[in-house]
C-alpha cells in the first residue's frame, strides 16, 4: 500500500482550509440563509437579538446539513483520486475531483438568467480567445451566477417577511393614534406583538424548514 506523502498532504490541508471561508460564501447555501436570518431580525425590529455570532452559527449549521451530500461526494472523489498524478500535480488533481459535486449543485440552483448574463458579459469584456472557450457550466460562470441567484432569492423571502411585520406596525401605529398616544414610539410597542406572532406560528421552524427544502 502506498503511503501518502506528508508534505503533499499538509499542502492540501492548508490550501483547503484557506479556501474554506471563501467557498462557504460563494458555492454553498450559507449566503442565502444568513441574509434571510438578518432580514428577519431587522423586520422584527430587534437589531441585536439574536446576536451576529448566533445568526452566523445557525446559518453555518443549516448550511452544513444542506451541503452534507455534496461534501460527502467531494470527499469520496478526493479519496478515489488521491494517488493519481505526481507529487507536484496531486493538489490540482484533488481539487479537480472535488469540484464536480459542487459544480452539479451550482448548476441545479443557479438561474438561467444569471448564467446567460455572465456568458454575455464575458463576450464583451474578456479577450475573444478566452471568451470563446468559456462554457455556461464552468465554475467561473456558475459561482457568481449562483451567488447572485441566492441573494435575489434571499431578498424575495425577506420582502415577504417584512410585509407580515409591517402590517403589525401599521395596526399598532393607528391604535396608538386613536388613543391619543402619538408620543409613544409605535416600533417599541409593536415588537412584543411581532414576537408573539412569530412564536405562535412556530416561525423559526417554518423558516428554517422552508430554507432547507428550497434546496430539494
Curated annotation (Swiss-Prot):
Family to which this protein belongs? Belongs to the FliP/MopC/SpaP family.
Q: Where located?
A: Cell membrane
Q: Which InterPro entries does the annotation name?
A: T3SS_IM_P, T3SS_YscR-like
Question: What's an example GO cellular component term for this entry?
Answer: plasma membrane
What NCBIfam families does this protein map onto? PRK12797.1 (NF009438), yscR (TIGR01102)
Q: A GO biological process this protein is involved in?
A: protein secretion
**Taxonomic source organism:** Xanthomonas campestris pv. glycines
TM segments?
6-26, 55-75, 157-177, 193-213
Q: Does the keyword Cell membrane apply?
A: yes
Entry's Pfam families? FliP (PF00813)
PROSITE patterns of this UniProt entry? FLIP_1, FLIP_2
- Membrane protein topology class: Multi-pass membrane protein
Highest rank taxon of the organism: Bacteria
Q: Keywords on this record?
A: Cell membrane, Membrane, Transmembrane, Transmembrane helix, Virulence
Describe the function of this protein: Important for pathogenicity.
Signal peptide residues are none
Q: What is this protein called?
A: Pathogenicity-related ORF2
Has UniProt tagged this entry with the keyword Endoplasmic reticulum?
Answer: no
Amino acid at each position: 500500500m502506498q503511503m501518502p506523502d506528508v508534505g503533499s498532504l499538509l499542502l492540501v490541508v492548508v490550501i483547503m482550509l484557506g479556501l474554506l471561508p471563501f467557498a462557504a460564501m460563494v458555492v454553498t447555501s450559507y449566503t442565502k440563509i444568513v441574509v434571510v436570518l438578518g432580514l428577519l431580525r431587522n423586520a422584527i425590529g430587534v437589531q441585536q437579538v439574536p446576536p451576529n455570532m448566533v445568526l452566523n452559527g445557525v446559518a453555518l449549521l443549516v448550511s452544513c446539513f444542506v451541503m452534507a451530500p455534496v461534501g460527502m461526494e467531494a470527499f469520496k472523489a478526493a479519496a478515489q483520486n488521491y494517488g493519481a498524478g505526481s507529487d507536484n500535480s496531486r493538489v490540482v488533481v484533488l481539487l479537480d475531483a472535488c469540484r464536480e459535486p459542487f459544480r452539479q449543485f451550482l448548476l441545479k440552483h443557479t438561474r438561467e438568467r444569471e448564467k446567460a448574463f455572465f456568458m454575455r458579459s464575458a463576450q464583451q469584456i474578456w479577450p475573444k480567445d478566452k471568451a470563446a472557450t468559456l462554457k455556461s457550466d464552468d465554475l467561473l460562470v456558475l459561482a457568481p451566477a449562483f451567488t447572485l441567484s441566492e441573494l435575489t432569492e434571499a431578498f424575495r423571502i425577506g420582502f415577504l417577511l417584512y410585509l407580515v411585520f409591517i402590517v403589525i406596525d401599521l395596526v399598532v401605529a393607528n391604535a396608538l393614534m386613536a388613543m391619543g398616544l402619538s408620543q409613544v414610539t409605535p416600533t417599541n410597542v409593536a415588537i412584543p406583538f411581532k414576537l408573539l406572532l412569530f412564536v405562535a406560528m412556530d416561525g423559526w421552524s417554518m423558516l428554517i424548514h422552508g430554507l432547507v427544502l428550497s434546496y430539494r
